[in-house]
């Protein structure tokens, strides 16, 4: 048994040696053949990019919520409408700035134009609605020192030697003149006062009328006075009126009387008196018409006052 096994081993070893030789010969022949290119290695697949959540995107009205979708084409920008094109609203030009005159008071200018100043009185005056506030402690007073006074109010209970007051004069202007040109002379009468110093001035329209206002200080009887003076050229119907208001107080009382004088200056108004609207006249031959099925109505009877029994 042992011999047989050894013989088998020799035979198996010979067979193995022969097989290896065949393999080597075959491999040698195969190595002489041209090498084929290796197959392409597939590229690694990248992980999909992380898309931010939709709730963090700002959605436009009518737009797409998908940030990767094609964006809509932008709306064409409308070209500006040229000035003066049909359908455009024309902006009225600003009025030219008013240049104050350097000489000649307002009254002097009107007289040079041949305009007559006719003083007006408050009784029966209806051409203009003039508002003059009356502060506490102030009363209407007669003042012979104010020529052609329309109304004068003053604080007779003040502590100053000088009585704080407001003077209003109204003139009807008879004659032809240019109100816009005339009002440029509104500063001159104040600027001629002794030691005049301007603190504020304006020629802006007042309640729609040409107007001038100038404020400042001047000297009178060894006192320094503080004053505000306004001129208004108002139109009522075919007539023109010069309305002038001056509010004056002692400089030492300017702070104490400030609320009162400010109330007068800021509350002053000049408005053209509006004529009452007239009811349209009935058509000739027309009669009052009643409700359907009723006889024509009669005009309403007047209010009757009951007579007490005798």
From Swiss-Prot:
- Write out the transmembrane intervals: none
Q: From which residue to which does the signal peptide run?
A: 1-32
Under the heading Gene3D superfamilies, the entry gives: Mog1/PsbP, alpha/beta/alpha sandwich (3.40.1000.10)
Top-level taxonomic group? Bacteria
Q: Where is this region: Disordered?
A: 278-310
A cellular component annotation (GO) from this entry: extracellular region
Instruction: Name any one Pfam family assigned in the record.
Output: Lpp-LpqN
Provide this UniProt record's keywords sorted from A to Z: Signal
**Family (UniProt):** To M.leprae ML0031.
Name of the protein described by the UniProt record: Proline-rich 28 kDa antigen
């Amino acid at each position: 048994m042992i011999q047989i096994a050894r013989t088998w081993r020799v035979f198996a070893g010979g067979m193995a040696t022969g097989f290896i030789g065949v393999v080597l010969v075959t491999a040698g022949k195969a190595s002489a053949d041209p090498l084929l290119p290796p197959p392409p290695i597939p590229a690694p697949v990248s992980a999909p990019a992380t898309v931010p959540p939709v709730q963090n995107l700002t959605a436009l009205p009518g737009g797409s919520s998908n940030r990767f979708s094609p964006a809509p084409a932008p709306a064409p920008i409308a070209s500006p409408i040229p000035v003066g094109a049909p359908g455009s609203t024309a902006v009225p030009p600003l009025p030219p700035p008013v240049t104050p005159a350097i000489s000649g008071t307002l009254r002097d200018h009107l007289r040079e134009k041949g305009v007559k100043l006719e003083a007006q009185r408050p009784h029966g005056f209806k051409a203009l609605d003039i508002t003059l506030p009356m502060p506490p402690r102030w009363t209407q007073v007669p003042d012979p020192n104010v020529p052609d006074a329309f109304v004068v109010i003053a604080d007779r209970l003040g502590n100053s030697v000088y009585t704080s007051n407001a003077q209003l004069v109204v003139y009807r202007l008879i004659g032809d003149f240019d109100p816009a040109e005339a009002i440029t002379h509104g500063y001159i009468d104040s600027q001629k006062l002794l030691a005049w110093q301007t603190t504020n001035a304006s020629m802006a329209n007042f309640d729609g009328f040409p107007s001038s206002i100038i404020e400042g200080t001047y000297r009178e009887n060894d006192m320094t006075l503080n004053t505000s003076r306004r001129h208004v050229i108002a139109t009522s119907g075919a007539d023109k009126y010069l309305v002038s208001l001056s509010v004056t107080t002692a400089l030492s009382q300017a702070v104490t009387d400030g609320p009162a004088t400010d109330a007068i200056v800021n509350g002053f108004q000049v408005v053209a008196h509006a004529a009452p609207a007239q009811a349209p006249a009935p058509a000739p031959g027309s009669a009052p018409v009643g409700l359907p099925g009723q006889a024509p109505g009669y005009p309403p009877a007047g209010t009757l006052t009951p007579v007490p029994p005798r």
